[in-house]
Curated annotation (Swiss-Prot):
It comes from Bacillus thuringiensis subsp. israelensis. Its cofactor is Mg(2+). This is Tubulin-like protein TubZ. The lineage of its organism: Bacteria, Bacillati, Bacillota, Bacilli, Bacillales. It is an enzyme of class 3 (hydrolase). Its EC number is 3.6.5.-. Residues 408-484 are annotated as: Required to bind TubR-DNA complex. Induction: Probably part of the tubR-tubZ operon.
Length: 484
């Protein structure tokens, strides 16, 4: 059983049984980043030992999945003959595009069969409420998979709504470009979805949750050496994954397993919040050890502005909110009217709560501190999109300047090697040729070739033919994943 947060350690160290969740996520991790997050979801188990989330990993580089600890080999989807996408999303999208690949439907059939095997029961019934797609926007497989998912939603491939968990890159121009294009495509999809579905309809693309690598690395660097991160060596990516995934798991198990003597936050409240808005969603998580209004307010603000889900969100565009304070049973501070008002007023600084739907509860647990989980949903594109575009442009301009400068220096320092070329071209000695004599036709007739030219043979290209013939092209009729 994976216990990768203080809260999960405490929950499972007590006699409190956890045998259900609010939303039955079917988790699919695409690309190296998505694989690692999905692997964490696969490690969560109920008190009875059964797995919380059915999970698949998808990757074009089989080696990227070798070190997964919780996803078994048969649940690691790899397409034969492919060895990665090299930060080129079109490798993914072209594979499933009938206009560019005549075998695209065969690949889609294989994907549908794998999803049907994992996410349906023996009667062919879907066993999940939502699909949670984890990916890194920037890599080839992750970015391409994000684009592919949008197209498959349009084709009604998925039998239930889809949520996306996306991490944004930092520092690499190619990855930033990929992320910007994917975010733009998501924004276009959301606008189209808004035209087709009403405010109270469950959306095919339920929500998109964004994590910013730059922000998460900054948090972990500031925490290194503190009581939260005592280790001498810290892999910030692993710590970030633990924080993001454990927070999502916590908000999913608490409403189902913890009640309140004041205001209960039901599983149905969470399901509604994560199903209807159809836009960007963010989560704030704040541990509260000092029970006073000032500490409470600052903790909530810090979790939203400087947390692991912070990405310069436009809170004023939110259409729903929700959350709860997981509090000690003897902490009457959280039931006090002034405390309730302070929480509402603090959230109201981000978005006037009387303008949007939502609910805030206060479930009880048997620990000494409290944890506040805050969710805003239905927001438009985060402003991080704008600043990321600015960073990408600056990096591209810097790269071009460096290339031009290097070319200029090379031109200035050009070396005359004509003497060497002349000597090499006149050298006719070959130790592997037998001496055939010096008579006969002129030895200098014919066209001139490079002195280093090698004998070449015609290449053949039949590598993928047999592999493509082995792909399953039909599905069982009970499979709910729609074929083209």
């Amino acid at each position: 059983m994976l216990l990768n947060s203080n809260e999960l350690e405490h929950i499972h160290s007590t006699n409190h049984s956890v045998n259900d969740i609010s939303i039955r996520w079917g988790v699919i991790g695409a690309g190296q980043k998505g694989n690692k997050e999905a692997d964490l979801f696969a490690g969560y188990k109920f008190s009875n030992g059964t797995t919380c989330y059915p999970t698949l990993a998808v990757n074009f580089a089989e080696s990227d999945m070798m070190h997964l600890q919780n996803i078994i080999k048969e649940d690691r989807i790899h397409f034969d003959g492919l060895k990665g996408a090299a930060r080129t999303p079109s490798v993914v999208t072209d594979l499933f595009d009938p206009e560019t690949n005549p075998n695209a439907n065969g690949y889609l059939d294989k994907l549908a069969q794998e999803l049907g095997r994992k996410f349906t029961n023996e009667e062919g019934e879907v066993i999940v409420d939502q699909f949670l797609i984890c990916l890194g926007a920037g890599g080839g497989v992750g970015t391409g998979w994000g684009s592919l998912v949008l197209q498959l939603i349009r084709e009604q491939f998925f039998p239930c709504p889809v949520s996306m968990l996306i991490s944004l890159p930092s520092g690499d121009p190619d990855e930033i470009n990929n992320a910007l294009v994917l975010l733009s495509e998501i924004d276009e999809f959301m606008r189209e979805q808004d035209r087709l579905f009403g405010n109270s309809d469950i959306k095919p693309l339920a929500n998109v949750i964004v994590n910013d690598n730059t922000q998460m690395q900054r948090i972990i660097e500031s925490q290194k050496g503190t009581k939260d991160l005592k280790n001498r060596y810290v892999n910030w990516k692993e710590v970030a994954n633990d924080n993001v995934v454990s927070t999502l798991h916590e908000i999913n198990i608490i409403p189902e397993n913890y009640g309140s003597d004041n205001v209960t936050y039901d599983p149905s409240d969470l399901i509604k919040l994560l199903s209807i808005p159809g836009r960007f969603l963010t989560i704030g998580k704040a541990r509260i050890a000092k029970f006073d209004l000032h500490s409470l307010e600052n903790s909530i603000k810090r979790s939203l502005d400087e947390g692991f889900f912070s990405a310069e969100h436009q809170f004023e565009t939110a259409t729903m909110y929700g959350g709860f304070v997981l509090r000690p049973s003897n902490a009457d501070f959280f039931k006090d009217v002034n405390t309730e008002n302070r929480i509402r007023n603090t959230l109201g600084e981000y978005k006037r709560l009387d303008e949007i739907a939502g609910k805030f509860g206060d479930p009880i647990w048997d620990n000494e501190y409290a944890v506040c989980y805050t969710i805003f949903a239905g927001m438009t594109m985060p402003k991080r999109y704008i600043s990321l575009a600015r960073e990408g442009k600056e990096l591209a301009e810097k790269q071009e300047q460096l290339r031009a400068e290097a070319q200029r220096k090379q031109d200035e320092e050009k070396v005359d090697i004509s003497f060497a070329t002349n000597r090499v071209q006149k050298n006719t000695f070959n130790p592997y040729n037998k001496n055939q004599g010096f008579g006969g036709a002129s030895r200098f007739s014919g066209g001139k070739n490079s002195a280093f030219k090698r004998q070449t043979s015609e290449a053949t290209s039949t590598q993928n033919q047999q592999e493509e013939e082995n792909i399953i092209s039909t599905l069982k009729t009970s499979n709910p994943f729609k074929k083209r």
